[in-house]
Structures are given as structure tokens and as C-alpha cells.
């Protein structure tokens, strides 16, 4: 394993960075000069990330994988941003709640709630020391009610609560749950099999609002990306 001197650049860990919003966010952070660590289950999808991004293949629900991530963070000597992006939609077609089994529940809640809860706990000392940002990618399904979205939506509602609870218990950090809105991603397509989702915006269009929130100093809370003002860049 490569040994790193303590990083002089801000350090970000973004889970699930191989595709969709995670990949777009990893790319933008790296281009902005952040020292970025990310992970994904499929190693093949991590090979063409931007130069300088540290990519770790593995399942975020696996304790050994999380321990490996923690080693990479410790080598940097700091953690300024922790983004919980990795998640699963669950069984498709999306089931009604009365069709959800205990196995379905566990398969969704372990990556969507359990892993973020314990990974945050494992990395909390570094995040608190830096006065960093804890940011979880939420969904409007966490607060609205759509047929078939109950299992996934409940997991995101729980993730919102966990995220903001960490903020309440650790006032030295800022904690954000962010609803990015509908996006043109593989996960969104899986939720609407056979439908044309080409009218949905690309994940890259959401990233500026998220980056501005990270930099804003706004109080901990739940935010919609579409409602966040984005400053025009002056070139």
C-alpha cells in the first residue's frame, strides 16, 4: 500500500464514486484540488477516474472494506468531507410495501443506513478535528410518498435522520442531507425500466449546487439542490 504524507489539501471521501452523481462529484472535487478517496463494488468501473483519485474496490457493508478505507483516511491525517453517496434501490420492479420481505429490507437498509452510520462513527474523530462536513445524498422519496418507493424512501428518511443527528451531537461539524432531484443515472433508469429518461438532467448539473453548499457555511439541515442558489463563476 502506498504511504502518504499528511495531506496539505482538503481530503474528501465519497462512497460509491464509480458512476452517476458519485462519479460526477469525485471528478469535480479532484478538479478543484481536493485529495479524493472513493470506492465502489466493481473495480473495473474505478479504473478511469481522474488522476490522483484514490479508488478502493469493495462493498461498503463489509467491515474489512471500511477498515481499509479508514487506513487511507488515517494516512492523510485529516478528513474534511465525508459524502455518503453509495446506495441501492432494492428489488425491481419497485415493490409495494406489502410485498417487501425481511430479506428485501436488510438488502436495502444495510448499505443505505447501516454502512453510513458505522462508517461515520469510525471516521468521526478526523471529521470533528477538521471541523468538516458530513453530507448524505437523499431523495424526495424520503419525504414524499410514491407507489413502490416505500422501501427505498424509508431508507433515505432514516439516512436523513442519522446524518442530522450526527450534526446535532457534534456541533463542530456541519451535517447536510441533500436531495439532488431526478437525474439521468443507471439507478433512475432501473426504477423506470423501459421508460425514456433522457429528459432528466445529468448528474454533473447538480454538482455545482452541492459544492457551493459544502463551501457555504450554511447550518446543518436538509436541503434540495434545486433550491440552492449557485453563484455564477467569473472567468
Regions found by a protein language model. Give the residues of each.
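Active-site loop of short-chain dehydrogenase/reductase
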Residues: 9-10, 78-80, 127-138, 171-174, ...
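Conserved glycine-rich cofactor-binding loop
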Residues: 18-19
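Conserved glycine-rich Rossmann-like NAD(P)H-binding loop of the short-chain dehydrogenase/reductase
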Residues: 32-48
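Rossmann-fold cofactor-recognition segment
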Residues: 50-64
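Catalytic loop of short-chain dehydrogenase/reductase
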Residues: 88-89, 96-102, 131-158, 163-171, ...
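A short, exposed helix-loop element centered on a Lys and neighboring polar residues
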Residues: 120-121, 164
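C-terminal helical subdomain
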Residues: 173, 177-180, 185, 193-235
Amino acid at each position: 500500500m502506498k504511504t502518504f504524507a499528511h495531506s496539505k489539501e482538503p481530503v474528501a471521501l465519497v462512497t460509491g464514486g464509480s458512476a452517476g452523481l458519485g462519479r460526477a462529484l469525485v471528478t469535480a472535487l479532484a478538479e478543484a484540488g481536493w485529495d479524493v478517496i472513493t470506492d465502489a463494488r466493481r473495480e473495473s468501473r474505478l479504473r478511469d477516474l481522474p488522476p490522483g483519485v484514490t479508488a478502493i474496490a469493495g462493498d461498503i457493508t463489509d467491515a474489512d472494506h471500511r477498515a481499509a478505507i479508514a487506513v487511507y483516511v488515517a494516512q492523510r491525517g485529516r478528513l474534511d468531507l465525508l459524502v455518503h453517496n453509495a446506495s441501492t434501490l432494492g428489488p425491481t420492479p419497485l415493490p409495494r410495501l406489502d410485498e417487501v420481505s425481511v430479506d428485501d429490507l436488510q438488502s436495502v437498509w444495510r448499505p443505505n443506513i447501516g454502512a453510513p452510520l458505522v462508517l461515520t462513527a469510525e471516521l468521526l474523530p478526523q471529521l470533528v478535528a477538521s471541523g468538516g462536513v458530513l453530507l448524505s445524498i437523499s431523495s424526495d422519496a424520503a419525504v414524499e410518498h410514491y407507489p413502490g418507493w416505500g422501501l427505498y424512501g424509508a431508507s433515505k428518511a432514516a439516512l436523513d435522520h442519522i446524518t442530522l443527528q450526527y450534526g446535532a451531537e457534534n456541533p463542530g461539524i456541519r451535517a447536510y442531507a441533500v436531495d439532488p432531484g431526478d437525474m439521468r443515472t443507471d439507478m433512475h433508469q432501473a426504477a423506470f425500466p423501459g421508460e425514456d429518461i433522457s429528459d432528466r438532467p445529468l448528474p454533473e448539473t447538480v454538482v455545482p449546487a452541492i459544492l457551493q453548499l459544502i463551501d457555504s457555511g450554511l447550518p446543518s439541515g436538509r436541503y434540495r439542490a434545486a433550491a440552492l442558489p449557485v453563484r455564477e463563476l467569473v472567468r
